[in-house]
């Protein structure tokens, strides 16, 4: 186990209750520094409560939160960027005026804020929006502005709650690119809450899954996929299906098979964890004409569904 000092964010046995509803029940999570950490779970799982604690909006009833190895305190909020799911731009202000207002709230001087805003507005191709009324912006346009506002002060930890909702595919990909760039170039740690599992597959290196206020699983994405794979392989061959399945015996589990008229069969097989795929392939080539053999690809969607069953 890595030590707390290597973590951007640590939650230890955190609990929060609203009346009779337990929103978080003894949740412990560690977010490694410089990671893009996916916070997953169905609606009502406790994700928003957890995020609001980290952002300093609410406090836990019990448990501890640490920010880069020290107890999270009010002053740390200046080093946290937060894009909430419920967008919060003021409709009756101009875009540039409002962006400057939020930058000043983060402690930035006017000249520094104007310089950074100019760079970001150009990068995200919104430099023509400075004098627009916020009320004239589409959902996707407003989302871009709020994304800029959340990262303008170069936070050490960036919290993104459903950051891609409201974007078309082109702009969603642009935001994904910026999230990766913030991590790779600035060393920003990102806490990403989303229902979009394709984004988790594309962006996240670590995840935690919460459900009904409890943590169900946590870990590196590659290791969670490997565990969910459970020795399953995609195996395609040409030959006699009945003879091959008989030869398999107890050495592998047949999960599924799809056959074509020319005696080509696509299988999903489960081989024991202690059996290297190379050893299985060497045996199989003596039995049938092997067309392909590879570890089964497991998406985070499958990991999620298996965990909450």
Label the model's feature ranges:
Residues 177-270:
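ABC transporter nucleotide-binding domain
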Residues 33, 128, 237-239, 271-273:
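Non-catalytic surface loops within mature trypsin-like serine protease
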Residues 2-4:
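Pre-NBD coupling/linker segments of ABC/ABC-like ATPases
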Residues 272-309:
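C-terminal coupling/interaction segments
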Residues 6-9, 16-211, 217:
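ABC transporter nucleotide-binding domains
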Residues 68, 107, 146, 226-229, ...:
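A generic structural signal for secondary-structure junctions
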Residues 12, 236, 294-296:
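Solvent-exposed beta-strand sheet faces enriched in polar/charged residues
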């Amino acid at each position: 186990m890595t030590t707390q000092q290597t973590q951007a964010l640590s939650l230890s046995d955190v609990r929060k209750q609203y009346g009779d509803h337990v929103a978080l029940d003894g949740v412990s999570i560690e977010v490694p520094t410089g990671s893009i950490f996916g916070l997953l779970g169905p609606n009502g799982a406790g994700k928003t409560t957890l995020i609001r604690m980290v952002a300093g909006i609410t406090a836990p009833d019990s448990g501890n939160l640490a920010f880069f190895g020290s107890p999270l305190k009010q002053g740390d909020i200046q080093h946290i960027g937060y894009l909430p799911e419920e967008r919060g731009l003021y409709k009756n202000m101009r875009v540039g005026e409002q962006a400057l207002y939020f930058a000043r709230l983060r402690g930035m001087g006017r000249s520094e804020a104007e310089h950074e805003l100019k760079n970001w507005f150009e990068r995200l191709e919104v430099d023509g929006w400075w004098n627009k009324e916020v009320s004239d912006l589409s959902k996707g346009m407003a989302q871009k502005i709020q994304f800029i506002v959340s990262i303008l002060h170069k936070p050490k930890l960036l919290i993104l709650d459903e950051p891609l909702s409201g974007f078309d595919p082109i702009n969603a990909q642009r935001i994904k690119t910026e999230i990766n760039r913030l991590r790779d170039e600035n060393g920003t740690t990102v806490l990403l809450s989303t229902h979009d599992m394709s984004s988790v597959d594309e962006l996240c290196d670590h995840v935690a899954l919460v459900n009904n206020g409890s943590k169900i699983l946590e870990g590196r994405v590659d290791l969670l996929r490997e565990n969910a794979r459970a020795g399953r392989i995609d195996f395609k061959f040409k030959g006699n299906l009945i003879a091959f399945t008989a030869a398999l015996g107890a050495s592998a589990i047949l999960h599924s098979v799809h056959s074509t008229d020319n005696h080509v069969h696509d299988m999903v097989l489960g081989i024991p964890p202690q059996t290297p795929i190379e050893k299985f392939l060497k045996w199989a080539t003596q039995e049938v004409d092997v067309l392909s053999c590879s570890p089964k690809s497991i998406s985070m969607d499958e990991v999620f569904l298996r965990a909450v069953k």
